[in-house]
Swiss-Prot record:
Bilayer-spanning residue ranges: 8-28, 54-74, 87-107, 117-137
Family of this protein: Belongs to the UPF0756 family.
Protein's UniProt name: UPF0756 membrane protein BCB4264_A4705
Compartment(s) of residence: Cell membrane
Keywords, alphabetical: Cell membrane, Membrane, Transmembrane, Transmembrane helix
Region forming the signal peptide: none
GO cellular component, one term: plasma membrane
Membrane topology: Multi-pass membrane protein
Primary subcellular site in the record, as a coarse category: membrane
């Protein structure tokens, strides 16, 4: 008999494949691999508590690679500071990082939100040619909106 969790993941896998969401399909593939090799009992608790922070660390490493390779240095930083587009990008980077911070907090305290975020992403990708940017920004936006709603209650 197929468990509810396996069926749910399988449905999400099909949706991810239809929507061509590589991150979702790879993530589900890894979860299936862990689940069916019985490593899940050991790894799932760790991923549930530390997975988001681990993912943020990997993303941070990827963002810092151009600095580590010398592709971006002080010269490029100085040149960028002369452009108002760079200042807009800087402000956008700060805003997105702050939104993502709220997203991490929301996903940590309210993990069932992830399902709604995944479905929202799949709908946007499948129906509106959107780009799957991951659950942190979506969760951050949700956190910001929820915080605003709480202020008026």
């Amino acid at each position: 008999m197929i468990s509810q969790s396996t069926l749910f993941l399988f449905i999400l896998l099909i949706i991810g494949l239809i929507a061509k969401n590589q991150s979702l399909t790879v993530a589900i593939g890894v979860l299936f691999l862990l689940k069916f090799t019985f490593l899940g009992d050991k790894v799932f608790p760790y991923l549930q508590t530390k997975g988001i922070n681990l993912g943020v660390t990997v993303i941070t490493i990827a963002v810092l690679v151009p600095i580590a390779t010398g592709e971006i240095g002080f010269k490029q930083l100085g040149e960028a500071a002369k452009s108002y587009y760079a200042w807009i990008a800087l402000a956008s980077g700060v805003a997105v990082a702050l939104l993502a911070k709220g997203g991490v907090q929301l996903l940590t305290t309210d993990p069932h939100i992830t399902t709604a975020l995944v479905f929202g992403t799949v709908i946007a990708v499948a129906l509106f040619n959107g780009v799957a940017v991951g659950p942190l920004i979506g969760a951050g936006i949700a956190y910001a909106v929820m915080s605003i709603i709480q202020m008026f209650k």
